[in-house]
Amino acid sequence: MKMRTHSGAKKRLKVLSSGKVKKKSTRMRHLNSHMSSKTKRQLGKTSYVEDANMLQVRRCLVF
């Protein structure tokens, strides 16, 4: 069986030249009127995949 890149992962994640994996923060689509401006500002920034999850991400992004 062929190894394939996970379609959902390739749409949501980007591997940087340093080896880190960039991702968009969640919880910013809707139902955020009750959130403080500080929370919304922090969630708007990009974040990185934690080291504990890197093995699973590397398996999804084989190519």
UniProtKB/Swiss-Prot annotation:
GO cellular component: ribonucleoprotein complex; ribosome
Record's protein name: Large ribosomal subunit protein bL35
Cited SUPFAM superfamilies: L35p-like
Entry keyword set: Ribonucleoprotein, Ribosomal protein
Region listing for Disordered, in residue ranges: 1-45
The keyword tRNA processing is annotated on this UniProt entry: no
Organism field: Bdellovibrio bacteriovorus (strain ATCC 15356 / DSM 50701 / NCIMB 9529 / HD100)
One GO-annotated biological process of the protein: translation
Signal peptide (residue range): none
